[in-house]
Amino acid sequence: MVGAFSHLDTAAGQSLAGEGISRLEQARSLPYRDLMAKAEKSTKASKPSTKGKKQSKAAGKSKARAKLSPRRLLRRWLGRATLGFLVVTLLPILLFSVINPPTTHTIWSEYRRLGDVDREWVPIEHIAPALGRSVVAAEDARFCQHWGLDAQAIRAAIADGGQRGGSTISQQVVKNVFLWQGRSWFRKALETLMTPMVEAVWTKRRILEVYLNVAEMGEGVFGAEAAARHYFGVGPDELSRRQAALLATVLPNPKERSAAKPTAFMRKRAAQIMDGAATIRADGRAACFED
């Protein structure tokens, strides 16, 4: 009997002890879980969401824009517009400094009007030096002395009431290659802005080479190669001084004048051009485009 009671006491003691340990562990574990849960909540609360960050950045930018004065906004947009203009204009200028222009606005317009044009590109080495000197003497005697815009020629044109042009060969190249024909202040402004850029990138020899290949020298006749064969039946490297001077007289009015059938005025003008070509060769004003 005593043994049985002692056995029961032992079992009851073990049960109570186990229950006590279990309660103790539960009591210990509950605060730990609560602590961990609170820690996780605080961590989540301390970390702002990506969406929140983006919204705060956007709000900051909008506030910064709002703080900008109209003058600053205008400066910013003008700066961007200027940068865009420089990129758009410099790329073709750089490209055509090494690649020959495939066509021009005038050539394309005449091709559409006439159905065909006479034109073949030739390097300046295959063009008689007399033609280069004649064209410079006739169109822009100070070609080697200015940076694209000739102030003296502009003043002379204004004094003459606009009866004669003040455009340099460089300006004519810009107009022919990059712009369009016709008179407008907008085109003239673009031409004035782009000409110094061409002068800064191209050599004078390259400018003259392009001019001699794209200039209109007769109805549907463009460039030295086509003009030499059309009027005289010779190659551009075989032109005489007189033939070169006659071609130069055609340039101001290529649709009305013919180098093969010169008028009295054209013959007189050709003689003046021959003298001018000899002068710029002697005084060094042809040095920038001749070897």
Describe every region a protein language model picked out.
Residues 1, 7-9, 24, 85, ...:
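Residue-level detector of alpha-helical transmembrane segments in integral membrane proteins
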Residues 3-8, 14-23, 27-30:
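Short, low-complexity intrinsically disordered segments enriched in A/P/G/S/L with frequent Arg
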Residues 31-291:
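Juxtamembrane regions of bacterial inner-membrane/periplasmic proteins
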